[in-house]
């Protein structure tokens, strides 16, 4: 799975720390998510999408063709 967290975060002018605070996670978690090293729970994915002004997690998280992480 790949994410568009970094792109949407920068579009909003947010730092990793600011996004982390909005979502309720550490900056390290945001870094891991942006680098594709961590797959979030469904609840966390929804929190991130909302924090980035998106209604659908599919706007942020993109499943690979084969469904792999």
Curated annotation (Swiss-Prot):
The record's InterPro entries line, in alphabetical order, gives: Cro/C1-type_HTH, Lambda_DNA-bd_dom_sf
Domain HTH cro/C1-type intervals: 5-60
Keywords of the record, alphabetical order, are:
DNA-binding, Transcription, Transcription regulation
Molecular-function GO terms, alphabetical: DNA binding
Q: Give the matching Pfam families.
A: HTH_3
Q: Which residues bind DNA?
A: 16-35
| Name of this protein | Uncharacterized HTH-type transcriptional regulator MTH_1328
Originating organism: Methanothermobacter thermautotrophicus (strain ATCC 29096 / DSM 1053 / JCM 10044 / NBRC 100330 / Delta H)
